[in-house]
């Protein structure tokens, strides 16, 4: 045995997983520095006296010299100080990589191993997929579970087998955002500056019988079938007229967020503003219908697909919808607003990110930006500035805000601390714009999924700065940027993008 193999280091094992909490704090132990993940997992399972061994991963939280032990993990601590012990790496290699000796004391957080997500299915769409959203209330029946917004202006509803069960025709340019409000209500936003409220009839969610709509009809890449033939085979009843058209923005809508319990919608627009709306059109002021919307479809094929989706349904788009104005339009950004999100637990608070490099906090009760030093003689807007354009946003249960950037990384911000502290952590791995973010299921509040123009979706544990897993597109094309990603426990990870595909990967569940 060499001298290196015989070295040991003092370790304290801690966890935030309530299902893995010991009855009393685990005592410090001396472990060989040659141990890797499996060896550490065996030790922790022995200390916990588990009936069945639990596969574990390890986050090295802190390394301090000469303190006689490691500090207890702080529930409110930022996520940037942890380093994931990668597969194949040992404590010895971690110490060497960080310039540490075995005389330090290590605090190591143990977490359940997250299994890599596997590919489940891929559905063809006629045009680029700008946005996807999973119906969180779906329970495995034949109703639609995925809503997608497409660059041909059509919002499509899909069941879990890839059948198009509804086509929502209203936008005259790219449908860039779509969100479920309830089992039978959705909202969409487009490059035509409009939001649409939809209430598809439940009768339209039936599975088509064999020979009506199947895989052949969904294969829009097939050379033997034209778009017209495939879309004509969808019954007219599966095309839906918008319930209301919402006006207020003067430039394309980039993102939407919904808080169903309070019936509120917020929108991000390229006009630099955040719109506030209701899920009930009766709560919003009636306005005169606009005679035209900007940004109409320029592609002949896209116009044809939209016309076919609309044919025979009796829908007349904007003219058939009730015209409503916003509850409020909140200005303040100096460039396009790229994404919006509600606070994770307070529906009166919202956040927005922009190409102007900033994050703003909004008080929806007053429809104004939150003041960072309200009550003082010189209050200022709570604005957090970064050095790069921000493209995507989601809120996390710990109170953190995750922002995807044009600089290819994800930054974590804590709105509870002063705005002068811009970044709490930086998650690095993507090689192009981070265009979409979605937090993981409630069962693990630290998981996050990101979609990028590099053609991948990455899975993160925000307690460490490196991704856990990378999902590649099954479509082997050169142009495969991911524009939208959503992650729900009832289905898995759904992504869509430049390859005209909606891809489903299963939940990378904890072992």
UniProtKB/Swiss-Prot annotation:
Positions of region (Sufficient for interaction with ERB1 and association with 66S pre-ribosomes): 122-511
Gene3D superfamilies for this protein: YVTN repeat-like/Quinoprotein amine dehydrogenase (2.130.10.10)
InterPro entries, per the entry: G-protein_beta_WD-40_rep (IPR020472), NLE (IPR012972), WD40/YVTN_repeat-like_dom_sf (IPR015943), WD40_repeat_CS (IPR019775), WD40_repeat_dom_sf (IPR036322), WD40_rpt (IPR001680), WDR12/Ytm1 (IPR028599)
Keywords, sorted A to Z: Nucleus, Repeat, Ribosome biogenesis, rRNA processing, WD repeat
GO MF annotation terms: ribonucleoprotein complex binding
Keyword Heme (UniProt): no
PROSITE patterns for the chain: WD_REPEATS_1, WD_REPEATS_2, WD_REPEATS_REGION
Mapped WD repeat ranges: 124-168, 170-208, 248-287, 332-372, 383-423, 429-470, 477-511
Biased composition (Basic and acidic residues): 208-219
Region described as Ubiquitin-like (UBL) domain: 9-112
Pfam families, per database record: NLE, WD40
Cellular compartments per GO CC: nucleoplasm; PeBoW complex; preribosome, large subunit precursor
Compartment(s): Nucleus, Nucleolus; Nucleus, Nucleoplasm
Gene Ontology biological process terms, A to Z: maturation of 5.8S rRNA from tricistronic rRNA transcript (SSU-rRNA, 5.8S rRNA, LSU-rRNA); maturation of LSU-rRNA from tricistronic rRNA transcript (SSU-rRNA, 5.8S rRNA, LSU-rRNA); ribosomal large subunit biogenesis
Region feature (Disordered): 207-228
SUBUNIT field: Component of the NOP7 complex, composed of ERB1, NOP7 and YTM1. The complex is held together by ERB1, which interacts with NOP7 via its N-terminal domain and with YTM1 via a high-affinity interaction between the seven-bladed beta-propeller domains of the 2 proteins. The NOP7 complex associates with the 66S pre-ribosome. Interacts (via UBL domain) with MDN1 (via VWFA/MIDAS domain).
Similarity comment text for this entry: Belongs to the WD repeat WDR12/YTM1 family.
Role this protein plays: Component of the NOP7 complex, which is required for maturation of the 25S and 5.8S ribosomal RNAs and formation of the 60S ribosome.
Official protein name in the record: Ribosome biogenesis protein YTM1
Source organism (scientific name): Yarrowia lipolytica (strain CLIB 122 / E 150)
Gene name, Swiss-Prot/TrEMBL: YTM1
């Amino acid at each position: 045995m060499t001298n290196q193999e015989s070295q040991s280091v003092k370790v304290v094992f801690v966890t935030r997983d309530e299902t893995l909490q010991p009855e009393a704090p685990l005592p410090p132990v001396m472990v060989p520095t040659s141990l890797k993940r499996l060896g550490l997992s065996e030790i922790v399972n022995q200390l916990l006296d588990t009936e069945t061994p639990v596969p574990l991963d390890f986050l090295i939280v802190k390394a301090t010299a000469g303190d006689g032990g490691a500090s207890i993990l702080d529930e409110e601590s930022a996520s940037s100080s942890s380093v994931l012990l990668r597969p194949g790496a040992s404590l010895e290699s971690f110490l060497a990589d960080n310039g540490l000796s075995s005389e330090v004391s290590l605090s190591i957080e143990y977490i359940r191993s997250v299994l890599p997500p596997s590919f489940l299915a891929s559905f063809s769409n006629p045009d680029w997929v700008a946005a996807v959203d999973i119906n969180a209330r779906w329970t495995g029946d034949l109703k639609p579970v995925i809503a997608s917004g497409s660059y041909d202006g059509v919002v499509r509803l899909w069941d879990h087998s890839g059948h198009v069960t509804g086509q929502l025709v209203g936008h005259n340019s790219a449908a860039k955002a779509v969100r479920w409000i309830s089992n039978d209500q959705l909202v969409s936003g487009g490059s035509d500056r409009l939001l649409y409220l939809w209430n598809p009839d439940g009768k339209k969610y039936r599975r088509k019988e064999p020979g009506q709509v199947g895989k052949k009809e969904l294969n829009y890449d097939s050379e033997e079938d034209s778009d017209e033939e495939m879309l004509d085979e969808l019954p007219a009843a599966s095309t839906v007229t918008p319930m209301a058209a919402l006006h207020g923005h003067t430039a394309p809508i980039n993102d939407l967020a919904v808080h169903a319990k309070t019936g509120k919608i917020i929108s991000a627009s390229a006009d630099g503003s955040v719109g506030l709306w209701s899920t009930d059109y009766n709560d919003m002021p009636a306005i005169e219908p606009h005679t035209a919307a900007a940004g109409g479809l320029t592609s002949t094929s896209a116009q044809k697909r939209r016309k076919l989706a609309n044919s025979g349904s009796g829908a007349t788009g904007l003219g058939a919808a009730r015209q409503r104005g916003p509850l409020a339009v909140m200005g303040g950004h100096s460039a396009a607003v790229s994404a919006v999100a509600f606070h994770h637990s307070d529906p009166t608070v919202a956040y927005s990110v922009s190409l102007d490099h900033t994050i703003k906090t909004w008080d929806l009760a007053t429809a104004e930006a939150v003041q960072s030093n309200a009550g003082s003689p010189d209050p200022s807007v709570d604005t957090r500035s970064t050095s790069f354009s921000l493209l995507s946003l989601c809120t996390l249960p710990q109170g953190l805000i995750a922002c995807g950037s044009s600089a290819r990384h994800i930054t974590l911000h804590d709105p509870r601390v002063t705005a002068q502290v811009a970044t709490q952590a930086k998650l690095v791995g993507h090689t192009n714009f981070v265009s979409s973010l979605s937090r993981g299921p409630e069962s693990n509040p630290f998981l996050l999924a990101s979609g990028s123009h590099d053609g991948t979706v990455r899975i993160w544990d925000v307690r460490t700065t490196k991704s856990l897993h990378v999902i590649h597109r099954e479509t082997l094309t050169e142009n495969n940027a991911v524009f939208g990603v959503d992650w729900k426990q009832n289905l898995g990870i759904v992504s869509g993008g430049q390859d005209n595909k909606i891809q489903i990967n299963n939940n990378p569940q904890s072992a």
